[in-house]
Amino acid sequence: MIDENKQVNHTSQQLGESTEVKQAIMSESPAQINNNESANEVTEPVAIPTNVVGDTTATEDNGFTATQIQEANTAALAELTQQISSLKTQLDERSTQYMRIAADFENYRKRTQKEKEELDLQVKRNTILELLPIVDNFERARSHLKPQTESEMTIHKSYQGVYKQLVDSLKRLGVSPMRPEGQEFDPNLHEAVMREPTDEHPEGTVLEELVRGYYLGDRVLRHSMVKVAAPKEDTLPAQENQSSPADS
């Protein structure tokens, strides 16, 4: 009996302690709940609704609708397309200008090159023309002077050697002599200073070259002075006219 009373007392004590613990927890829980609610009010952000009443289109994170984004992209694409078209037009214009400038420069280069060649040729021509009379004198001396003695032959050979050097130098510069004998008279190449009546050659044939002409390259450096064939006059009518008074 004594043991049973002890167990009953022990159980009642445990129940009493449990009741006290529950009361203590109940007395403390309202304050903790209030503190937790206030903390939630301070720290938790206000949630943004994902759907707007009256609008069935969902919004993106930045607040723009998909339709607005598509319209903005379309406008940006149209602007970029216009810029590309404008740049292409400018590129075509610049390309055309470049080609025109390049063509003008090429024409200028060719023109200046041609002018330079013409100037060089003119300077060369004027210089050689001053030397041709010396060549003429050498040729006259060779045709007219006939050395008789050994000393004269030595002198003849010496100046003929100078003449040969001069002619060789002119050849290297592109000078070549004309050979008009037997050809038809050409006013672009020849200068007629004499006419000789003859029936052995057609009229206008070059019979003799009196002063040698020269080419410089494919151009005339100096015209040849020539003697040209002319038709021979018929003297029979004149003789008949002279004899007719005597017969009368």
Curated annotation (Swiss-Prot):
Q: Which InterPro entries match?
A: GrpE (IPR000740), GrpE_coiled_coil (IPR013805), GrpE_head (IPR009012)
Record-linked Pfam families? GrpE (PF01025)
Task: Give the span(s) annotated as Disordered.
Answer: 229-248
Superkingdom, taxonomy of origin: Bacteria
Keywords, A to Z?
Answer: Chaperone, Cytoplasm, Stress response
Where does the UniProt annotation place the signal sequence? none
Name its GO BP terms in alphabetical order: protein folding
Q: Spell out the subcellular localization from the entry.
A: Cytoplasm
Gene Ontology MF term list: adenyl-nucleotide exchange factor activity; protein homodimerization activity; protein-folding chaperone binding; unfolded protein binding
Q: Name the principal localization, coarsely classed.
A: cytoplasm
Q: Where is the composition biased (Polar residues)?
A: 238-248
SUPFAM superfamilies in UniProt: Coiled-coil domain of nucleotide exchange factor GrpE, Head domain of nucleotide exchange factor GrpE
The entry's cellular-component GO terms read: cytoplasm
Q: How does it assemble?
A: Homodimer.
- Role according to the record: Participates actively in the response to hyperosmotic and heat shock by preventing the aggregation of stress-denatured proteins, in association with DnaK and GrpE. It is the nucleotide exchange factor for DnaK and may function as a thermosensor. Unfolded proteins bind initially to DnaJ; upon interaction with the DnaJ-bound protein, DnaK hydrolyzes its bound ATP, resulting in the formation of a stable complex. GrpE releases ADP from DnaK; ATP binding to DnaK triggers the release of the substrate protein, thus completing the reaction cycle.
Q: Give the similarity note.
A: Belongs to the GrpE family.
* PANTHER family on file: GRPE PROTEIN, GRPE PROTEIN HOMOLOG, MITOCHONDRIAL
Q: What is this protein called?
A: Protein GrpE
Q: Which organism is it from?
A: Nostoc sp. (strain PCC 7120 / SAG 25.82 / UTEX 2576)
Classification lineage: Bacteria, Bacillati, Cyanobacteriota, Cyanophyceae, Nostocales
